Structure formats: C-alpha cells, structure tokens
Amino acid sequence: TVTQAFDDYDPTRAARAIEDFTSEQLSNWYVRLSRRRFWKGEMQEDKQAAYDTLFECLRVISQLMAPVSPFFSDWLYRSLTSPASAGITDSVHLSNFPVSQPQNIDSELEETMQVAQDLCSMVLSIRKKEKIRVRQPLSRIMVPIANEQFRQRLKHVESLILSEVNVKELHYLEEDNEVLVKTLRLNFKALGPRAGAQMKAIQEKAKHLTQADIRKLEQEGKIALQLADGDFELMLGETEILAQDIPGWQVAVNGNLTVALDITLNDALLSEGRARDLVNRIQNMRKDQGFQVTDRIRIEWQADEAFAAVIAAHADYICAEVLAEEILQCDDPALDFFDIDGLRVGLRLALAPSPATN
C-alpha cells in the first residue's frame, strides 16, 4: 500500500497508511497486548520474540517514512541500529527501501486477529454505552457461531479477547439458538436506486423473513426474495441487522458478527473491580513519587470495613501487580486519601527495605 502510494506520487496516502499501521495495529494492539511479555523478568524465548517483532516493525517503519519524514525517520533508524551490524547502513537514507514479502503473509492469522479486534471493539462499545469502566470485570459474553471455521478462529483468540475486554467467560452459541433474536431493517437509501417501484413489495417481504433467512443473509451476503413480478436479490449492505436485547444483557451487531454481554454485577465482580481501581491508583502514585519500574515497595493503607474486605480478598493480586513486599493497615490521618467507587481509602507508599538492610 505504501509503495503503491509513493509510485502514484501520493505521499498523503502513504503517510496515512503508515500512521494507521503504527497507531492502530502496532501501538494500540500489538504493543498493548504484549506488555506482559515485555515485562517478564528474564530474557526468555517468548520475551526475545516480542522484542524482535517490535524492532523489525519500527525499523521498517523508519524506512517507509523516510521520504516524507526525513529527520525523524533517520533519528529512529539510528536509535534502533548499529552500523557495526551486518547489512546496516549509517543512515536510513542509505538503506534500501523495504520490499514487500507476500510469502510471509499469513492470511488466516490476519483474519483471525481481525475477528478478535472486531469483537473487542463491540464489547468495549457496549461498556462505554452502559458506562461500565473496563477495569470492572464482567462475567460472560455470548457469540453465535456461524460455521466451524469461525469457531476455530474464535477459540484461537478466546483468551486474548477475554483479557482485552476484562470478561471471565466466552460462551459459544449455535446459529439456531433461541437466545438471540435478530430483526432486519431495510436501508432505504442504499436500496432505493435499485428497488424502484418494487420497494413496497420488498419491504413487505422483508417483514416475514425468518431467523434462518436472516442467518443466510449474514453468511452469504445476499438472499432471494420472491416477489409477484419475479425474484429480487437483497444484499446484506442494503439492510441493517439488529438483535433484541436480553434482560441483564446488551447485544451488539456488526456485519455478520454478533456479541451479547452480561452486564449484571454481583458482589464478587464489584470487589475485583475495586481492587483493580486500587492497583491503578497505586501505579499512578508510584509514578508520581518517582519510583523505578523494578522498585519493590511497602504499602500502608486505611479504609472502612467495606474496602478493607476488598483488600483482604485481593491482597496477593494487588501486591503482585504493584511489586509490593508488604501491604499493611494503619491508622494515620496523614495518608493520601481518595475515593474509589464511592468508598474512601488512604494510602502511603515507601520503598521496601532491601534484603541487606533487614
């Protein structure tokens, strides 16, 4: 795409393609999902692979952007490479422009990852609509399975999806399930030029489409409607498919993808959500106090009975996430106080004593 844009003397299109890949695919997806791989203690094979992939992406990006961002691209290239390395030049402008290697493209993996991205986006949009923060865990999502290929793709990225949207379980629904009921609405603007005088008859026929008919339209992208003056082929893009909400759930539809999210919150989920909010608050305090990423810390806290129960239930998780050696309750009005989900909590952080000083 970038090479073709430059060949067409269209640097704007090339720059936008680079920006989209860097922002959406690399930063907002790969880097964010690989954070735990980067943070692993020892340089094991998986951690090395994560860094190697990121390095290769950044190196190629520096070369792709060189014609439109000569100074920054050269700084990035020099920061990543060493002239002493084999095949590495002193400047990005002395290196060869990258050549696409289509033999390395794994189309099945790309399509599988697209399913993951689309489903995550749909679930997160429901959270936003319902004003449920992402740090608040939810119990389950349901996804109708169109075919065996889709099932296998979903299984491949199930754990990734659940982690990204902070949901406990993913339930697979067969397409003939009676849990999710879909309705079809015609897109008159898209359909009008082609339907003409048949519009009223098409509208009447569309009202009587069954769940099986709607599934066929989703899977095949079209469906034949038998009208009085002959068949009319209704296209998926000329319709809008909606799903009826289930009590306690919210449903989203995007093309042939449907997902239902259980938005019911119980005490256990609320407790875990508050623990995650506390971790976020402690991480921000670590940063504000200038602690290093690897520093071990000591936490002192004060809270009412409700939040004390949260800390007691999730102390191990909290300590592991923020690198705390101790998390101790105290009674000191000099702590930093703030609210979490309407509950008042006080905190104080300090560096944990090193083993040599114990």
What is the role of each PLM region?
Residues 1-358:
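Feature 926 captures the class I aminoacyl-tRNA synthetase adenylation module centered on the KMSKS loop
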